Amino acid sequence: MWNNFFVFILLLMSAVSCVNVPENGTIAAYSVSEDTVSVSIRGNVPVSGEWDAEWIHRYAADVDKLAERAAADSREEIDVLFFGSSSIRLWRGLEEMMAPLSVVNRGYGGATVRDILVNYDKLMAQYRPKAFVVFCDNDICGNQVDLSVSGVLDHYRLLFDRLDQDYPGVPVFFLSWKYSGLRAFMRDKQRLVNSIMADYASGSEQVTFVDVNSTLLLLDGDINPELFESDDLHINHDGYLLWTSMLKPHLMRVCER
């Protein structure tokens, strides 16, 4: 009965054993078969859910293109790997804005933290960055497969733990979820996600919360429409310049530039 479904399973234990658990009991990768996905991780992170296989792989072609692009890139050591959803993918001029840092853009449109976890190996490829930047705010956008606010935190904890296992000591910069006119009806949940993620980061040596959303707001707390594209969802060049002004000093510091 589980055909065409991907199942995310996490047992609540101090050291969890699902599939592909290393002998030392630390986090293991997602294990993907024809109709299941399982997770193994150490720690206390309860996560469960079911998603249609077609949905979880809806951007497989885009992810494959990123993998092909990485295969053609001879670099391994870079300064910063950016990944996440369309707000990363559409960051035109990222290399110039972040210069002299060497950066790689691994964003793809519509990404959620769930399919980032599934596509993790393809997204990270061969790169060994000094820092990660992630922006991905599609797990709560008003559709039937939305996560709860607590579910967003749980899945990001999975992602952060996997990064810490594979890239020990490498900092992760989490960009706050941005408000937009198109998703104004989601603002209370977006605000709560930002509050929870900021609180999480405050107790983490790995994760830094960067409140880029604040750069897009007017004094009354509403969004500045002059910083958005006509779709009322994505930011424009001026918006990215503001994000850069807030984020780049952090990256220059950790990359020792």
Place the predicted regions along the sequence by residue.
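Catalytic nucleophile-elbow at a beta strand-turn-alpha helix junction centered on a G-D-S/GDSL motif
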Residues: 72, 78-93, 111
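Conserved beta-strand scaffold positions in the cores of enzyme catalytic domains, especially
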Residues: 82, 103-105, 209
